[in-house]
Swiss-Prot record:
Residue intervals on the Lumenal side: 25-407
PANTHER family cross-referenced by the UniProt entry: DOLICHYL-DIPHOSPHOOLIGOSACCHARIDE--PROTEIN GLYCOSYLTRANSFERASE 48 KDA SUBUNIT
GO cellular component: oligosaccharyltransferase complex
TM spans (from-to): 408-428
Protein name per its UniProtKB record: Dolichyl-diphosphooligosaccharide--protein glycosyltransferase 48 kDa subunit
One Pfam family linked to the record: OST48_MD
Species assigned in the record: Xenopus tropicalis (Western clawed frog)
Pathways per UniProt: Protein modification; protein glycosylation
Taxonomic path: Eukaryota, Metazoa, Chordata, Craniata, Vertebrata
Length: 437
């Protein structure tokens, strides 16, 4: 009887472990302004759950919050839906979030016109500057028909989106509904992405005050949604609108107030929000290097050292993460460089089945070289692969017996020898005339 109980307990424990393993997905901490956001933004959170994300909902001021424990990150992703928070709870602060990003973590931030200093400081760390508190993006030409009168319920056309299907999705979107604070990008930060910009008639200011000074953001410099991919491939997305992710904006009809504008039954917010979440949480645009090989043409294994002017073949396997599986990447602009200090050879790789390959002739220069693939494209993780090889000069037995470029020198040498031979014959057989008395 006792052994039966032990067996039952072992089976139950195994089932629990198996179930927890099946449920395990990317660990995501969601910091909320208040717990009601789980209901008002349920469609967005449900889309994450349906894709296997393990969501942990906490209020932003929870005193038990922790992002790092014993030097290890407790979560893979961070969502901040608490724009007006003045202090995060527990041991979470801007330094902790910056360390999380430096460690490769992904962060999604939603702000609003009521924005606190922590989010403003986090934006500055990532090259994004929010406008002042209580300001909003205003557009007197592109506002929704349901706007209450301040013209801050903006209708953004899909033409204002970044031309990067990996980030914003491939399907054409309906107009985007936006209400929130404007942002500007640091012009000295080349890593910032202008994902969604305002129209040429938009600006950011206090909606209930007359304009007395030049606005913080004007025209297409006004960012509604911005992104960042760090050099370590960590990704961050900032949205100036908390309502952008809400169920109300997902299901709302949209129509510009201008006469003759088309009416759409639904906004494009949901499709864009899902595409952004897939990119920022590294479900899209993730590349990796598979097998790399190089050898002389006609051989199958790399030599200990190449010889100058060898004809070599280089191949590399590049894979892309798609729906949780690694599949061959399809690209036509991948280049290979053969580098010593500067590139001696730069050529495009051609797709051959599931790999990219190319044949080329080594330069007539010896030294230590690298086969280098450095692929950095918008929306994709930075792909970098190097393989170091040695290139030696020709051995004495490998040189040609006569070098065509040296024919003039050969001719000059033989002509001198021939001239000396003729001179010697003439000199030896020449007889001086006898002097007469």
């Amino acid at each position: 009887m006792a052994s039966l109980r032990v067996s039952v307990l072992l089976v139950a424990a195994s089932c629990l472990l198996l179930g927890s393993g099946l449920r395990a997905g990317p660990r995501t901490l969601v910091l909320l302004e208040n717990i009601n956001l789980r209901e008002t933004h349920s469609l967005f959170f449900r889309s994450l759950s349906d894709r296997g994300f393990d969501l942990s909902f906490r209020t932003a001021d929870d005193p038990s919050l922790s992002l790092i424990k014993y030097g290890e990150f407790l979560y893979d992703n961070l969502i901040i839906f608490s724009p007006s928070v003045e202090d995060f709870g527990g041991n979470i602060n801007i330094e902790t979030i910056s360390s999380f990003i430096d460690g490769g973590g992904s962060v999604l931030v939603a702000a609003s016109s009521d924005i606190g200093d922590p989010l403003r400081e986090l934006g500055s760390e990532c090259g994004i500057e929010f406008d002042e508190d209580k300001t909003a993006v205003i557009d007197h030409h592109n506002y929704d028909i349901s706007d209450p009168g301040q013209h801050s319920l903006i209708v953004a056309d899909s033409e204002s989106l970044l031309k990067a299907p990996t980030i914003v999705g491939k399907a054409p979107l309906n107009p985007i509904l936006f209400r929130g604070v404007g942002m500007v990008a640091d012009p000295d930060n080349p890593l910032v992405l202008d994902i969604l910009t305002g129209s040429s008639t938009s600006y950011s200011f206090f909606p209930d005050k007359p304009i007395t000074q030049y606005p913080h953001a004007v025209g297409k410099n006004t960012l509604l949604i911005a992104g960042l991919q760090a050099r370590n491939n960590a990704r961050v997305v900032f949205s100036g609108s908390m309502d952008f992710f809400s169920d109300a904006f997902f299901n709302s009809a949209v129509q510009k107030a201008a006469g003759g504008s088309n009416r759409y039954a639904k906004t494009g917010n949901y499709e864009l929000a899902v595409a952004l979440s897939r990119w920022v949480f590294k479900e899209e645009g993730v590349l990796r290097v598979g097998q790399v090989s190089h050898h002389r043409v006609g051989e199958s294994s790399p030599p200990s050292a190449y010889t100058v002017t060898d004809l070599v073949e280089y191949s590399i396997v590049i894979e892309q993460l798609s729906n949780g599986k690694w599949v061959p990447f399809d690209g036509d602009d991948i280049q290979l460089e053969f580098v010593r200090i500067d590139p001696f050879v730069r050529t495009f790789l051609k797709k051959n089945g599931g790999k990219y390959s190319v044949q080329f002739k080594l330069p007539d220069v010896y030294g230590v070289f690298q086969f280098k693939v450095d692929y950095n494209r918008l929306g994709y993780t930075h792909l970098y692969s190097t393989t170091q090889v040695s290139v030696r000069p020709l051995q004495h037995t490998q040189y040609e017996r006569f070098i065509p470029s040296a024919y003039p020198y050969y001719a000059s040498a033989f002509s001198v020898m021939f001239g000396l031979f003729i001179f010697s014959i003439v000199f030896l057989h020449m007889k001086e005339k006898e002097k007469s008395d």
